[in-house]
Amino acid sequence: NDLGIGTDGGGSVIYPALSLNLYSFLGSGVNLKSSIIKKSTDNIEFSSGIGFISRDLETLYSAVTTLIVNKCKETTFKIAVLDNLEQDEKINNIHEKSFISNNFDSDDRIDIINKLNIIFNKYDILIAKEEMIDFNSYGDSIIGNFGNKSKQFQLNSNKKLGKVLNMMDLTAITVPTCEISSSYIIIAKKGYDYIRPLFEIASLLEYKENLLTKKYFNDFLDNKNIIFQL
């Protein structure tokens, strides 16, 4: 498949893509939302957002612009980058930016929401990076509900910001890095104006596709056979 379409309550589009080094787009900030109100496992009301997962940014962009007319006005956007990315070589491609403190040291959704609200009172776009998602353990909130050991197992999945983006009606793109189960998360305020800058930033953060996995899966699709020549 070239494209996956799914719903995201608390990270169900963002994190499958991130854990598999795929690209994703969450459209909660541009009204790609369900009208049904639900409650999360930690008692937060939300309606599910709609998003896309793809192997490349071009396919993702085509899907988004097919559904959403780009209404972006020519204006300047204030971009914040978490300061743990100051030495990141890809971040150097973004010239107009401000580094801010990465104080997301809790997995608590309310705490994350409060901190993001403070950031988006001043900035339009935030760039973060989350790593080793669902690699050491599986971060499912149902699993984490069975005592302290299962809660720690859930926490070891390293999920943070992606758990609240839909609940806050934000728009986001994930761009995989060259490390396993790791991606940049580019997050924007609610509004159609941010579609273009989100994709422009995403294009600046792209790594070359892993050639071995590309050859493996392309050969499988073309020949219906997982055996290929190295």
What do the PLM-derived regions correspond to, one by one?
Residues N1-V64:
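Short glycine/serine-rich loop segments
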Residues G4, E96-F99, L170-T174:
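Conserved beta-strand scaffold positions in the cores of enzyme catalytic domains, especially
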Residues G6-G9, G27-G29, R55-L57, L82-N84, ...:
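Fold-independent oxyanion-binding glycine-rich loops
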Residues I14-L20, I37, I91-N93, Y138-S141, ...:
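Short acidic, glycine/serine/threonine-rich loops at helix termini
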Residues I36-N43, T66-E74, A172-E179:
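Short, flexible, solvent-exposed loop/turn segments with mixed acidic/basic and small polar residues
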Residues Y61, N117-L230:
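Glycine-rich, small-residue loops and helix-cap segments
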Residues T65-Y138:
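Gly/Ser-rich, acidic/histidine-flanked active-site/gating loops
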